Design a protein with these regions (language model features):
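Active-site glycine/GP-rich loop and adjacent strand/helix microenvironment
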Residues: 1-191
Length: 191
């Protein structure tokens, strides 16, 4: 979908474990609407889906096509292994860093930071590499370096949401962004 290849399929053609963009249409197919969610089928009899993210929330600055489900799974695996508690996080590309290769910047507001933070960061990268083969290839071939975790002060994400007029329970900060707008704002709150 991100590459501009649009192929409609019916339920009889879906595969368990593959991400799809959910399109709602009339029974005649005369019109259709992209609701903006990505889904994955977890069962075909009966049909069961999980929402894996939003179409507009992805990172593909280097061709990696990282989606919300992949970063959430990687972070959950790290928290289960190393402990800690996260209030919120977001990931964005750093295309032109001052030093070294481009990379993904993770901005995390911890409620409780893991005790072994350096191992946490290494395992986070390893977990994401297991989730996404394109990201793994880019890191393995030194096109980009492993991800960088930036800890931000308590209240940083609320400050960002307030700055864009969306503070409140009905709004969430995007987990992924293909630009630096959120990352640049949160860079002012680094610990």
């Amino acid at each position: 979908f991100l590459k501009g290849v649009f192929q409609r399929i019916t339920l009889k053609d879906v595969v368990v474990g593959k991400n799809y963009v959910l399109i709602i249409s009339t029974c005649s197919g005369l019109w259709s609407y992209n609701i903006g969610d990505t889904i994955m089928f977890v069962n075909l009899n009966p049909y069961k889906i999980i929402i894996t993210g939003r179409v507009k929330h992805y990172i593909s600055a280097f061709g990696e096509h990282v989606i919300s489900k992949e970063v959430e799974t990687a972070l959950e695996m790290c928290l289960m292994r190393f402990g800690g508690e996260v209030f919120s996080f977001t990931v964005c590309p750093n295309i032109n860093p001052e030093n070294g290769l481009p990379h993904h910047d993770w901005f995390i507001e911890f409620i409780k930071k893991p005790a072994n933070f350096s191992s946490f960061c290494e395992y986070l990268d390893t977990s994401l590499r297991k989730q996404n083969i394109y990201y793994n290839d880019l890191v393995k071939n030194n096109i980009i370096r492993p991800l960088v975790v930036n800890c931000v002060k308590v209240g940083s994400f609320n400050n960002y949401m307030k700055s864009i007029g969306k503070l409140g329970g009905q709004n969430k900060c995007p987990l992924l962004s293909n630009d630096r707008k959120i990352g640049d704002f949160l860079s002012n709150y680094l610990i």
